[in-house]
UniProtKB/Swiss-Prot annotation:
HAMAP family: SmpB (MF_00023). Disulfide bonds: none annotated. It comes from Bacillus cereus (strain ATCC 14579 / DSM 31 / CCUG 7414 / JCM 2152 / NBRC 15305 / NCIMB 9373 / NCTC 2599 / NRRL B-3711). Signal peptide: none annotated. Keywords: Cytoplasm, RNA-binding. The gene is smpB. This is SsrA-binding protein.
Length: 155
């Protein structure tokens, strides 16, 4: 992913818990008028979202963008499938990798960059239950060490 990511609107924390993220890609989003307004307001949920390659195009499914509150009867469908904009080489690479067993395309975060909504898309491999427990133990150990240093600094 490029160095300068813009303002992060939404993150998929569950993806980092359930998957090993091997590569990340920056993809543009094809949106309707009221969708970008809802994204700017931060009313988007990536929790159950996933991406698929279909006919040489990448589509994101189950990404929930709430309807725009000031919108009229032409408001968008919150759960519609949305197209992602990637280079052809990236799409071919993702299509080949996603066909392998255990790999998935997972949306990681949505952010604004130069006025455009972008999505960080991760090529991910699923974690087993023991991997999740191991990561949780490591996280707790780091937290205990940080707490011990903080308490020592106070004395």
């Amino acid at each position: 992913m490029p160095k300068g990511t813009g303002k992060v609107i939404a993150q998929n924390k569950k993806a980092f818990h359930d998957y090993f993220i091997e590569e990340t890609y920056e993809a543009g989003l094809v949106l309707q008028g009221t969708e970008i307004k809802s994204i700017r307001a931060g009313r988007v949920n990536l929790k159950d979202a996933f991406a698929r390659v279909h006919n040489g195009e990448v589509w994101v499914h189950n990404m929930h963008i709430n309807t725009y509150e000031q919108g009229n009867r032409f408001n968008h469908d919150p759960l519609r499938t949305r197209k992602l904009l990637l280079h052809k080489k990236e799409i071919d690479k993702l299509a080949g990798a996603a066909k392998e067993t255990g790999y998935a395309l997972v949306p990681l975060r949505i952010y604004l960059k130069n006025g455009f909504a972008k999505m960080a898309l991760g090529l991910a491999k699923g974690k087993k239950q023991y991997d999740k427990r191991h990561d949780l133990k490591e996280k707790e150990a780091k937290r205990e060490i940080a707490r011990a240093f903080r308490d020592r600094q106070k004395m």
